[in-house]
């Protein structure tokens, strides 16, 4: 918490109380003692720069319990999840809801592996090759080309009309081995580089465990 001597661990319990910020700002929010206890434990660990291993059962409200002290803290926060679906849920729903309820001006970034981001270079090359024979792949490529002109993130999860498991994505995303880096003509517009830059600048970064292990 920004100044432990002033705010103390108790500060983190206040937003979760029955008259706190979360109750006022989130519909159907109901405080739970186990949730308050966990929030205090997380806040205490942050204040002491200690390691905390917390296990809580279903219905505890674990997400809000760690997000409240994390967002009230003034330092960099990395939230790591087990799946990309949970990443998206945190980034798109849970964190914005808690941030609004707490009225804290923290910035948020979402960072996934490079295989999740459309690559302009490989998209251009695939379009120019014209080697796709399956009608489904041709249709998917057309959808991806349209997506490339409108997306600000390049995150393939945003394009629901093309399944994330579709093989066409292998042709329009990059790997560490075939990425041209700074030599690429699209480097300034690279979605991977943009996501990494935003993650460096953000107060809260949402990653998955694979990315977390690779970069921490």
Language model features: what each stretch is:
Residues 43-44, 63-76, 93-97:
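Walker A/P-loop NTP-binding motif
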Residues 47-66:
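Walker A/P-loop
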Residues 15-25, 76-203:
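A substrate-engagement module of RecA-like helicase motors
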Residues 202-212:
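Conserved two-lobed SF2 helicase motor
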Residues 1-12, 212-215:
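Single conserved hydrophobic/aromatic residue that forms the stacking wall/gate
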């Amino acid at each position: 918490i920004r100044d432990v001597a002033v705010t103390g661990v108790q500060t983190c319990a206040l937003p979760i109380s029955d008259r706190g910020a979360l109750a006022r700002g989130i519909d159907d929010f109901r405080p739970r003692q186990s949730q308050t206890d966990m929030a205090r434990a997380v806040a205490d660990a942050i204040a002491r720069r200690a390691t905390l291993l917390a296990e809580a059962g279903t219905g505890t409200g674990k997400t809000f319990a760690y997000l409240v002290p994390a967002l009230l803290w003034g330092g960099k926060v990395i939230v790591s999840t087990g799946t990309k679906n949970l990443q998206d849920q945190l980034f798109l729903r849970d964190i914005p809801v808690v941030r609004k309820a707490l009225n804290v001006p923290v910035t948020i970034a979402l960072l996934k592996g490079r295989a999740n981001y459309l690559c302009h270079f490989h998209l251009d090359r695939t379009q120019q090759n014209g080697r796709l024979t399956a009608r489904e792949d041709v249709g998917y490529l057309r959808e991806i080309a349209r997506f490339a002109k409108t997306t600000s993130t390049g995150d393939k999860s945003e394009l629901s009309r093309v399944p994330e498991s579709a093989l066409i994505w292998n042709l329009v995303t990059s790997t560490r081995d075939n990425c041209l880096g700074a030599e690429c003509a699209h480097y300034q517009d690279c979605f991977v580089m943009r996501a990494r830059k935003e993650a460096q600048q953000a107060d809260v970064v949402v990653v998955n465990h694979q990315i977390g292990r690779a970069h921490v």
